[in-house]
């Protein structure tokens, strides 16, 4: 009697490690901007904070493979402005697009300054 062993095929998508302290630079329609970002990662979920001259703001996001999405909200003339960063991680860099609510979008480059311990 011939027995067949069936092993289910499981595709495992490894998530890039994006935890650490980042310097993010944007080129958007209103000019150039820069923020410092601390990202904590648990599986595919991201949390942390964004710091710029206007203050400190909580962030949330996800990572899938080498695709990263980070979102935070800042007060802009009394109304909240949601900023979304979509990019691909390449080693110690993230390159992609920043979307500033309905104001516009532009390119971004982020560089990891240090990793979380």
Question: What is each stretch, according to the model?
Answer:
Residues 15-116:
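Central antiparallel beta-sheet cores of small beta-barrel/beta-sandwich binding domains
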Residues 1-9:
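Bacterial N-terminal signal peptides
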């Amino acid at each position: 009697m011939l027995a067949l062993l069936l092993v289910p095929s499981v595709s495992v998508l490894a998530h890039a490690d994006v935890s650490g302290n980042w310097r993010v630079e944007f080129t958007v329609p209103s000019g150039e901007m820069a923020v410092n970002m601390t990202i904590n990662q648990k599986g595919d979920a991201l949390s942390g904070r964004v710091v710029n001259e206007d203050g400190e703001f909580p962030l949330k996001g996800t990572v899938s493979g080498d695709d990263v999405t980070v979102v935070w909200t800042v007060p802009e003339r009394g109304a909240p402005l949601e900023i979304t960063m979509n990019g691909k991680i390449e080693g110690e860099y993230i390159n992609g697009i920043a979307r500033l609510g309905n104001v516009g979008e532009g390119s971004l480059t982020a560089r990891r300054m240090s990793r979380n311990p």
